[in-house]
Amino acid sequence: NRGAQLVLSRSSKEMVTELFKLEVPEIAEEVIQIRSVARDSGARTKIAVKTNDVRIDPVGACVGMRGSRVQAVSNELGSERIDIVVWDDDPAKLLINTLSPAEVTSIVMDDDSGIMEVIVKDENLALAIGRNGQNIRLASELVGWEIQISGENDNLDVKESPENALIKYIGVDQELADKLIENGLSLIHISEPTRR
């Protein structure tokens, strides 16, 4: 008989929470709350924090002077990267905080399915998704919604023919639209007019 076994794990989310309680007195004193944790153990963690005192910056308190507090937690976790964001009760605002610095241009939420359709600027798409999809997976876990993400140009109406787009947006006739397409015009970028 081997007796009772004790299994220890360094991969749990609760370990991250407890380490922050040790390093950040404001968390231990419940002035700051860790509202959500998403973790890819050994690689990256995202935490969302909220303050009960408007005079305290919850992210700054968790990061510490010159990053000392978050670095101490990271060192305990084998140099795991830790992202700290401000909690928001609105899942869309929380997602925007979580994906920053990637710029979100649109969010459509379907409460019934629990899916958020998110559009980011094309140049931010790779940043928002992260290496091997890690960033968007952790963001989804942190927010508690399934996230479908795409760039702005991924959402162009693919059913609309180039000829029809020229006619509709530029105001040319069918004959000119056909000639433009024949001569290699294949993509139209439509932007709002600038005001001077």
Stretches found by the model and what they are:
Residues 1-187, 191, 195-196:
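RNA-contacting regions in translation and RNA-metabolism proteins
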